[in-house]
Amino acid sequence: MENLYAGLEMLARWDVVLALFVGSIGGVIIGAIPGVGPAVAIAILLPATFSLDPIVGLTMLLGIYGSSMYGGAIPAILINTPGTAVNALTSYDGYPMTQNGEGHRALSLAYSASFWGGIFGIGCLILLSPVLALIAPMFGSREIFLAALLGIILVVLAHRGQIFAAGVLAMFGIFLQTVGLDAVTYTQRYTFGYSFLSSGINLIVVVLGLFALSQAFFLLTAPDNVPDAKPVQGKMTAGIKELMKHKRVATVASAFGVVLGMIPGTGEFTAQFMSYTYAQKTSKNPELFGKGSPEGLIASEAANNAVPAAAMIPLLALGIPGEALTAMMLSVFYVHNVIPGPQLFQNHIDLVYGLYFALILLNVIVMIFLLFSTNLLTKIIRVPTRFLGVMILILSFVGVYSLRNSLTDCMISASFGVLGLVLKRLNLPIVPIILGMVLGGIMEVKLRSAMPRL
């Protein structure tokens, strides 16, 4: 009970509540605008959170992460253009429902299923992360090295059809984290005589380049487009009752989201695809899938919204991120000398419970906001892509420069932006580079500390 009160007390602070509202509502808006996405938004905001209290910065980023998929369902359903990549399957059944004049029903079902999946995922986070944190001290350097290596392998295997490319990009990420000071001997390595590489390549500089700047370049080089989304008419609460008729589908899909969200490299799309396939195979009306099936819509939305909370389980309990967004959040912990893992549950239990309550509250805030503001969001969808590109470009460079007031960082980030654009054009994954940088650092330190005992 003492931990419970500590978490509630932390969440009751005005700055935390403000950060949660800004992150939650901002995440919905960002998710609703095709071409932006949570990775871009979090990458841009990340430098600003370093000067904030850990709970404030993490709450804001969690708000964006957890709410963006709610918003991403809106354009997927109304204009057949997913707001985020993980809402791709939502358009399969959501858009046909809109064509049949049931757009309000589809949106209401999507919101309700997302809320169900979000709360289910948070419940599993609260139950499983302390248990995993208790087991974690039994892991030595060798076990943690193997866990990080497994994470790299799973990230690579998750990109079916691109396993070789994903493996090469993951190794490139591992190489990037070796540049600069040796983590054990503190000697220079791979600087090639350039002084600006002596302190290493900053993860945030790479993240902003690969995600934010590459997306800005992509939007600026693409034909200008203004999506057309018409206002929605009808009761937005109808889907809440209908969801209860399909609660088995919602629960199973949420379970898929939790299990796959805990596994590094799998993420929302894999969970969404597997839950959608399961729902179709077990449905009494499988022929409706892809033509406006409420079960298909519920399965996809419940699964992808259960993932954010589930992805926090290995991050909080082991300090191992499972995807790019949790890797970004890991940097917020490190900046404030708060190390995720078993010690987090011993020394900063109030922060842990504060994050639990923040996740619950963000789902409530987003659900209420969407029920009353959907038509407002349909207007926001109509933002021209060129305007988005310019805004992302400006904010990204401001974020990079604010890290160390360095123009060199801006040039490095721009280089990674070009690399990210090339990878997008070639339809190659970006995530393995980021996870290679994060998990590669863990692997190196743990391997070298374990070697004397081999």
PLM regions with names:
Residues 1-55, 137, 188-293, 378, ...:
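Helix-loop-helix hairpins and the membrane-proximal interhelical loops
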Residues 24-38, 68-80, 155-160, 254-266, ...:
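Transmembrane alpha-helix interface/packing and boundary motifs in multi-pass membrane proteins
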Residues 29-39, 77-87, 120-124, 260-269, ...:
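Short helix-coil transition sites and intra-membrane helix breaks within transmembrane domains
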Residues 38-48, 61, 76-96, 127, ...:
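Re-entrant/interfacial helical elements at transmembrane boundaries that shape
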Residues 55-59, 96-113, 283-296, 320, ...:
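Membrane-interface alpha-helices at helix entry/exit sites of multi-pass transporters
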Residues 65-76, 83, 293-318, 322, ...:
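A structural-propensity feature for long, helix-poor, extended segments
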Residues 66-71, 112-124, 132, 176, ...:
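Membrane-embedded alpha-helical segments of transport systems
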Residues 108-225, 335-454:
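Membrane-embedded alpha-helical modules
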